[in-house]
């Protein structure tokens, strides 16, 4: 479906499903050292424990929130106007940027002057910004100068998840508050494989990690609407959602809707991979309405400008595309600068060849001209553009394996070493960098990927697509990849790129986006637990407590997808009265293991003994009863 100009100009509306608050949740804000640092969280209300289980109060639980203003009932959402400029004052007060008269890219100016696009164009009233001559506006540049920016303080508060507040509320919950706090804060020791995860995230720790290149805050100065977030091995594992139109499917309205839907369910960043019509206009609508960082693959649009002929690409066209997108506010670029001419023959014996779109484009260009890639040769010039807008590099893995057969081969690791070399070049310019990774990798080969990335890329954040652990399940590749994502996240990957059920089959719709997001939220959280990230088990413990106490609504609401959990429960037990029942349809009222355990505990309390003693005593009583009845195995009814 192509974009409808009249629809966009006159009737563009936010997706109603994306703005409704999640059940029993409310948006709250934590204020930092200045009034304009207001960090959003989602607070989930809980019911009190039933009297028969102690009657204690269960305080609200705070969770990370990526949905921006969309789930705040106090916010007025109008996608035709875009989101508030959260970071505008922070950017301007640093005094190192200038306002341009308008777009400076040839393509950007041409689109602005095309009257046929007026009806569909986002009505942006402000000009783009750029660093003043000689200035560097990256978060890494500030960090290396010892400056803690508002963005750094913001992410420090965000990563802490108001944990101290939750601990205090547990202790104040009643006479058993201290005991309750100990129980709900209990967490198994993790294995972080050498990561340096602190007990508490401070603004200074954030600054130090960015200065070292171990973390990035993707935040273009032309995306003031973004709510800062951090990607790094020593922080919570993040996930990315891919959206984007194609030549045969989807338009601007649908892509904005996918973005708002993705962030509702937990997408930390979104990549717009559009390759169809109106790429420039689609991206503008997405960025102006996105509270999360937006990434792109600029070579896709550059290819469209030469009618899909890779050999016709030039440095000048690519450079103009970088500037065009940087002035719109793209926060990170995937650039496949590691696909070098000498590496292409290494893929000859692969089962699936070069599967990266960007990688195949550059491979074709290199072979057509029999020259080294202009992305590699002009890399320092690319860095000059990046640091003028604070666009982060996502150095693309154009030679990633497209099947388990090709995993961990010579081509893949030759490119990885090159990405490590380019990382150091970017850091020389104080440009933020993360490294993209595979792909398709059997489970036993995943850890090697993480170890070599840390070695060759100097601990720059790793950002992987899965990896898919088997190739036998088209239609279920969110699962085949979720397995690999959980493992590589545990080993140290900082951000996981989601895979939807439509992977290898078609363009994902809204349902596919949600399925991919939830799958990857599970993988990321499982990785945080395995790494021993402080406080990672709090939500698990709260949900387990609700489950044991048959607080069904709390079970639904504390989960990643309350709607689906409630829907499944309602399929067999739809009545409201069943939301307090001490069983579900799996086992019924007489075989619920948790109900039986509670019966044992009640018996123990009535007898003044421990639960273990009660089990022993109960068995003895049954033995005596058995003997009194004649010690017969069977009795007539």
Curated annotation (Swiss-Prot):
Taxonomic lineage: Bacteria, Pseudomonadati, Pseudomonadota, Betaproteobacteria, Burkholderiales
Annotated gene: thiC
Domain of life: Bacteria
Cellular component terms (Gene Ontology): cytosol
Reactions accelerated catalytically: 5-amino-1-(5-phospho-beta-D-ribosyl)imidazole + S-adenosyl-L-methionine = 4-amino-2-methyl-5-(phosphooxymethyl)pyrimidine + CO + 5'-deoxyadenosine + formate + L-methionine + 3 H(+)
Subunit relationships: Homodimer.
PANTHER family reported in the protein's UniProt record: PHOSPHOMETHYLPYRIMIDINE SYNTHASE, CHLOROPLASTIC, THIAMINE BIOSYNTHESIS PROTEIN THIC
Pfam family, one: ThiC_Rad_SAM
Organism: Bordetella avium (strain 197N)
Role, per record: Catalyzes the synthesis of the hydroxymethylpyrimidine phosphate (HMP-P) moiety of thiamine from aminoimidazole ribotide (AIR) in a radical S-adenosyl-L-methionine (SAM)-dependent reaction.
Note describing how the cofactor binds: Binds 1 [4Fe-4S] cluster per subunit. The cluster is coordinated with 3 cysteines and an exchangeable S-adenosyl-L-methionine.
Associated pathway: Cofactor biosynthesis; thiamine diphosphate biosynthesis
EC number per UniProt: 4.1.99.17
This protein's name: Phosphomethylpyrimidine synthase
GO terms assigned for molecular function: 4 iron, 4 sulfur cluster binding; carbon-carbon lyase activity; zinc ion binding
Keywords: 4Fe-4S, Iron, Iron-sulfur, Lyase, Metal-binding, S-adenosyl-L-methionine, Thiamine biosynthesis, Zinc
Protein family membership: Belongs to the ThiC family.
Tagged with keyword Cytoplasm: no
First and last residue of the signal peptide: none
Binding site for Zn(2+): 440, 504
Needed cofactors: [4Fe-4S] cluster
Residues engaged in binding substrate: 242, 271, 300, 336, 356-358, 397-400, 436, 463
Enzyme type, top EC level: lyase
Keyword Membrane in record: no
Residues where [4Fe-4S] cluster binds: 584, 587, 592
GO terms (BP aspect): thiamine biosynthetic process; thiamine diphosphate biosynthetic process
InterPro entries: ThiC, ThiC-associated_dom, ThiC/Bza_core_dom, ThiC/BzaA/B
